[in-house]
A protein has these predicted regions:
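Blade-level signature of beta-propeller repeat domains, shared across WD40, Kelch, NHL, RCC1
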Residues: 340-363
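Beta-propeller domain segments
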Residues: 22-28, 138, 155-158, 168, ...
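Hydrophobic core register within WD40 beta-propeller blades
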Residues: 47, 93, 141, 190-193, ...
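Asp-box/WD-like beta-propeller blade repeats and closely related beta-sheet repeat scaffolds
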Residues: 94, 106-144, 152-156, 179
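Conserved beta-propeller blade signature
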Residues: 54-58, 99-102, 148-152, 199-203, ...
Length: 363
């Protein structure tokens, strides 16, 4: 789960022990290698691949969206350009029909974009207003195969009944921000959303204060009108009926009969954030269509969990380690946030703990 504080405060308060300028000993499966794509960034978060292949990246703390192009195709960013600045904690990014969409904490804006742009040529157009800040401050934007815009917003709290229906949910809008309505509810903090094969997938950060092992972190397949349990229920076994949260104690166990369970689970408090489906051409065939998830890492577990990238089979729900080494003993040497598949088939991973973007490529 995500701590309900701004990142810098969270690192200090949670005792993560994140040392400055660490170079982690990152491990990936045989046949892969890890290299540095970019560094010297200010808590980089989510990425998007532009139509021409440039990598766009959000820096919420600095209020900027950066461009990290690799036009000489050497596997490293050629430069760092500021596409837009003065934004309000920008997080999720998406390209659609000649625009770059940016999910600020208080709403979604878009900038006109043409292939190769590294600086916005016009001002931001605000499309959607969202409840800003409030604990889970990130907002994520994604476009579906239907051309609609999907926006994820987290809760204000650890566990509560929200008064604003935009909280703890995914809403769907027309591309211009009109005709918004709830798409999926009962998701405490769905930081990562991604379409694949006609299905919208989501990561979710479960509640705190139930000990080291409850609830497990869940990965979900969302459907229009679906309810996914929070704050009344949570999944303890993948694909099995959710259980009633007796500690919260609102409503009843019958409520959980209507809650769709997670199709896959991982260790409690590991904080799943961004996800990406591998659709590139350079990994072995067995990785095609696999889901990769960045586990940002726990802040309140006696033995830390997360701090790695996992591979999730969208059919079986099997979860396995793919990229480890961000945690040395109980000391974090980085915190993975988001992933995208680059045009050359490499997997890029942001690390907001050390201000880097890592590149994983098949050898």
């Amino acid at each position: 789960m995500r701590k309900l504080l701004w990142m810098a405060a969270a690192l200090a308060a949670s005792g993560l022990g994140l040392a400055s300028a660490q170079t982690p000993d990152l491990k990936v499966p045989d046949g892969f290698k890890v290299s540095l794509y970019a560094e010297g960034l200010s808590q980089p978060r989510f990425m998007a691949v532009a139509p021409n292949g440039d990598i766009f990246l959000s820096e919420p703390r600095s209020g900027t969206v950066l461009v990290l192009p690799d036009r000489n195709k050497d596997g490293k960013a050629d430069s760092k350009a500021t596409f837009a600045s003065g934004l309000n904690q920008p997080h999720g990014l998406a390209f659609h029909n000649g625009y770059l969409y940016v999910a600020n904490t208080d709403g979604v804006v878009r900038f006109a974009y043409k292939s190769g742009d590294i600086k916005a040529t016009g001002s931001a157009q605000k499309l959607v207003s969202l409840p800003g800040g409030g604990g889970h401050w990130t907002r994520t934007v994604e476009f579906g195969p239907d051309g609609k815009m999907y926006v994820a917003t987290g809760s204000t709290c650890n566990v509560c009944e929200e008064s604003d229906s935009k909280r703890a949910s995914v809403w769907v809008y027309d591309a211009d921000g009109k005709n918004g309505k709830p798409y999926a509810t009962g998701l405490r903090n769905p930081v990562g959303i991604e379409w694949n094969g006609g299905t919208l997938y989501a990561t979710n950060n479960g509640r705190d204060q139930l000990g080291d092992d409850l609830p497990p972190e869940g990965f979900y397949k969302l459907k229009a009108g679906g309810f996914y349990g929070w704050p009344y229920c949570y999944t303890t076994q993948a694909g099995q009926p959710q259980v009633w949260d007796k500690d919260f104690g609102r409503k009843s166990a019958a409520t959980c009969q209507d809650a769709t369970p997670a199709f896959a689970l991982t260790t409690a408090h590991s904080a799943p954030l961004g996800l990406a489906f591998y659709d590139g051409g350079s990994f072995p065939a067995a990785y095609k269509g696999q889901m990769f998830v960045a586990l940002h890492g726990s802040w309140n577990r006696s033995t830390k969990s997360g701090f790695k990238v996992v591979q999730v089979d969208p059919k079986s729900g099997k979860v396995s380690d793919f990229m480890t080494g961000f945690l040395k003993g109980q000391t974090a040497q980085g915190r993975p946030v988001d992933l995208v598949v680059a045009p050359d088939g490499a997997l890029l991973v942001t690390d907001d703990g050390e201000g880097r973007v890592w590149r994983v490529q098949a050898q």
